[in-house]
């Protein structure tokens, strides 16, 4: 707001520092501050071998002590390196594709819980997983519609009963579309699903599933 409407450049950012730390807090720090410097404001880390999640547990990425705060950084989550969230972020995508081939049961829960699908966008994660599992390129719209994925992570962090990674696979296709300069044609979205409100994910259940409720 200040940058757009008041012509004041963004030079600092509010960042929440939470997880395995003595005194979790939200603090305003200058852009370019390292993770190590920011964390020192919240006390001592309470685990010996920490991992640093930059952003949220659903859409964030792993960083290091030397990662710097940018204008898009909103949180640093300190977790043990063997924590479920960290392990999932370190997964090998080639292995995940092979797991899709062997384990995806086409229950379509990923699509049923997809927030973009519920809004009427033509993204169906279960069809992407089916195409990947069977090396099926007969319907390219399945892959092109990956562009409608918001990357929220509900499909792989909560919905999939097999613990597969639809979001990560879809994001790879989405990146490939951008890299190839392919622009997705605008389509008229389908109507919002009537039961969209019933498909929403309770935050407390998500926190419990991710083993993060203890940090609340």
Across the structure, where does each feature detected by a protein language model lie?
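Redox cofactor-anchoring modules in respiratory/redox and cofactor-processing assemblies
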Residues: 1-215
């Amino acid at each position: 707001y200040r940058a757009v409407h008041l012509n004041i450049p963004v030079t600092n950012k509010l960042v929440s520092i939470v997880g395995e730390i003595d005194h979790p807090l939200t603090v305003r720090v200058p852009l370019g501050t390292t993770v190590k410097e920011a964390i020192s404001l919240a006390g001592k880390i309470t685990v010996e071998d920490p991992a640093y999640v930059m952003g949220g547990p659903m859409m964030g990425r792993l960083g290091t002590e030397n990662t710097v705060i940018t204008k898009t950084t909103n949180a640093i989550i300190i977790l043990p390196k063997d924590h479920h969230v960290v392990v999932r972020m370190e997964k090998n995508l080639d292995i995940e594709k092979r797991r899709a081939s062997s384990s995806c049961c086409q229950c379509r829960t990923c699509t049923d819980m997809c927030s973009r699908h519920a809004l009427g966008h033509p993204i169906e994660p279960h069809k992407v997983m089916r195409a990947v599992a069977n090396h099926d390129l007969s319907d390219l719209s399945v892959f092109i519609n990956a562009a409608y994925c918001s990357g929220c992570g509900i499909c792989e962090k909560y919905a999939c009963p097999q613990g597969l990674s639809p979001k990560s696979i879809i994001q790879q296709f989405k990146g490939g579309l951008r890299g190839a300069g392919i622009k997705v044609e605008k389509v008229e979205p389908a109507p919002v699903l009537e039961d969209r409100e019933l498909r929403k994910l309770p935050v407390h259940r998500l926190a419990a599933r991710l083993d993060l409720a203890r940090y609340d």
